[in-house]
Amino acid sequence: MSNIWLYFVPPIAGGIIGYFTNDIAIKMLFRPYRPYYIFRRKLPFTPGLIPANQERLAKRVADTIMGSLLTPSELQNLARRLLQTERMEAAILWLLQMSLDQLKLNTDTKSTKILANILRDLLGQSLPRLLKVWAKREYFLEAQINQIFDQILLEFQLTEIQAAQLSDWLLKVVVPPDVLRKTLIDFLTDQNISIIDEGFREKASGTYWVVANLFGLRNTLTRLRTFCLDERDLTNQRLMELITALAVKERITEWLHSLSMQNLPVSTVRELRNTMQNSVRLYLQENGTDLIQALSLSVAWEHIADLIINRLQASSIMNSSLELVSRELALILERYLERDLENIVALAIPILNIDQVIIDRIKGTSAEELEVAVNVIVKNELQAIVNLGGVLGVVVGSFQTILLVLQR
């Protein structure tokens, strides 16, 4: 009976010792989680291997990852895969759609005020400075002014109704009979009457010379002036009758209707066009800044911004053009990244500080959590090591049994 125990005890004992030795060794990688003290002296192997060297382990892991895995070239490849044109286009399209949806849902005046301030600064501050510089160029607005002159001014002609209305306004407002009467009185001064009378006497000939030297015009013109002064209403009536009898309104209407730059000589038209260009350019150089600023002050930018936002909210073109805009922006970014991706990654690595993130994450993880994480990853492998220890213990015990048998 004792011989039987002698044969079986070594393999069994070796297996048990090997199994539990490996199991204890694996557990001692993490346990105990904290140090233990006896008489103020720390016990050996407390805490476990990994908790005791967690900071150094974190540094080694970070160095390994940054030195072998996340190298600058690998980060560049990762950035290229992440920033493919299709992905960038989809991201930009999503951002634009989100912005448009937010704009549609926006009910406060924040967006309106921002857009109003942008428009006010653009027209009231930036545009005047640019206009002052542009106006110094010789051919500034030449094509636009020529187009306005050729298509609008050159072909402009009043219709018969417009000419009749303008002539009626001239005779009723600008030069009514009373204005003509006052103008005639102001013209018929004693000096002008004397000049007219002397000129008539000197230049008259034939029967007119007899009339001029016998009667003259002095008395007639003086009496006319006196009549205009004393008989105001009657003079206005006579002037109105004279205007009607001479068909002045019809003549002015006909003249205004036929008035057109196309009837002028070509050289005159060219000169007018050049004069218009120079006048506009000179005016913008001298007064363009004040004009734009005054115009900016007179515009209700909040109202215009509100109209623009409302128009954008209801515009179908905005929705249809988002894909095109996102595609163009993605292509621009792609060309930029092809040129400067290496520099961007080199600048991003210190900013991201990935190695420090890894160190902080490992140092901030408790030993218990590390043990759980390792067991989740290599549970079967660790159990195989434990089992291998038991198998090796059995093998060693079996060799001992064989040696004992041979010694007998």
Swiss-Prot record:
Keywords: Cell inner membrane, Cell membrane, Membrane, Transmembrane, Transmembrane helix. It is found in: Cell inner membrane. The chain crosses the membrane at residues 4-24, 385-405. InterPro entries: DUF445, UCP032178. One of its GO terms (cellular component) is plasma membrane. It is a multi-pass membrane protein. It comes from the Bacteria. Coiled coil: none annotated. Pfam families: DUF445 (PF04286). Its main location: membrane. Belongs to the UPF0754 family. This is UPF0754 membrane protein Tery_3973. It comes from Trichodesmium erythraeum (strain IMS101).
